[in-house]
Amino acid sequence: MSNLENLTSKIIEDANKEAEELLSEAKKEENKIVDEKVKKGNKAKEQIIEKSKREAKTKAERIISNTHLKIRNNKLEAKQEMINKVFDEAVIKLQNLSKDEYLDFVKSSILSLDIEGDEEIIISPNDKDKMDVNFMLTLNNKLKAKGKKGLLKISNENRNIKGGFILYKNGIEINNSFEALVDSLRDELEQEIIEALFS
């Protein structure tokens, strides 16, 4: 073999070796890039899954919280309805007083008030027939005995009240209607009623 052939053969052999090394390096670099991309992809996938889990948990907590709030509000509404019913029934019971019981209520209420004794009594149209002249005479005599004027009279004005009465003089009213009396007791009795109904 001539030196030229040896040299050519050596150059080709070196070129092949270098090409193989370059290919091997390129393959390694390719694998490295693919591995990095896979790792990044997996990391991104985990982050997306984690974010989705957090969002789902937050949404579930919000739904549960809203549901608890609705349940609480529904319970409060139901309790309030029952309490209102108790007070409405109290007014109805007062409306169903007999004539004598009603007149006793009016008499004792008026005699317990600090009045001058010349006011007008405003009543419901339903109660007009219960108060007669004899009742007014008796009531005025009792007021006189207490040092009052004893000049109470039934007003020509009617009010849409469910019972009881309103005393009127010079633009000032003392409201002793059944609904006003029950409402005035509501604040102090409501807690007792809640305990009686719901404990």
UniProtKB/Swiss-Prot annotation:
* GO CC annotation terms, alphabetical: proton-transporting two-sector ATPase complex, catalytic domain
Per UniProt, the keywords (alphabetical) are:
ATP synthesis, Hydrogen ion transport, Ion transport, Transport
Q: Name one GO molecular function term.
A: proton-transporting ATPase activity, rotational mechanism
Q: Which GO terms describe its biological process?
A: proton motive force-driven plasma membrane ATP synthesis
Please indicate which superkingdom the organism of origin belongs to: Bacteria
Q: Does the keyword Ion transport apply?
A: yes
Q: Which Gene3D superfamilies match?
A: ATP synthase, E subunit, C-terminal, F1F0 ATP synthase subunit B, membrane domain
SUPFAM superfamilies attached here?
Answer: V-type ATPase subunit E-like (SSF160527)
User: Which HAMAP family does this chain map to?
Assistant: ATP_synth_E_arch
| Known function | Produces ATP from ADP in the presence of a proton gradient across the membrane.
**Family per similarity comment:** Belongs to the V-ATPase E subunit family.
Record protein name field: V-type ATP synthase subunit E
Q: Which gene encodes it?
A: atpE
